[in-house]
């Protein structure tokens, strides 16, 4: 198994700073990530066909399966397998900001690639393998 990580962020509220609606302004801050920054997929179905890496797509797919098909983590970007600023789509389309496209966003993710999945038994444990192939439009 390959390890992935989501970069830790901080949110700041600066006293006296308000938006046009009178709400406190919030600032999302994170450390600089050294290396070649890549966007692997988006919340609207984009997949980088130049790299079409397996791990980011598998991570998104894993979040869908692990949540019982209730949500999916997309908009995977970062350096290598250190991801930053993900977006979450939920079945009901509620929470997680304006980028939550709900079931439509989930469908866009699955439309962007095809995958082959099979189980393999090893030492009495079943391992699920997913192989992704980006669709070239």
Tell me what each language-model feature is.
Residues 51-67:
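Short linear interaction motifs
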């Amino acid at each position: 198994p390959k390890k992935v990580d989501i970069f830790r962020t901080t949110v700041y509220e600066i006293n006296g700073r308000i938006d046009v609606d009178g709400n406190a302004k919030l600032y999302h801050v994170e450390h600089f990530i050294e290396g070649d920054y890549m966007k692997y997929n988006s919340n609207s179905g984009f997949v980088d066909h130049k790299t079409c890496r397996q791990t980011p797509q598998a991570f998104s797919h894993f979040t869908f399966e692990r949540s019982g098909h209730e949500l999916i983590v997309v908009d995977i970007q970062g350096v290598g397998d250190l991801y930053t600023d993900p977006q979450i789509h939920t079945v009901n389309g509620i929470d997680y900001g304006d980028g939550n496209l709900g079931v439509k966003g989930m469908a866009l993710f699955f439309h962007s690639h095809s995958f082959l999945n099979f189980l393999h038994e090893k030492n009495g444990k079943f391992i699920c393998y997913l192989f992704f192939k980006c669709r070239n439009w």
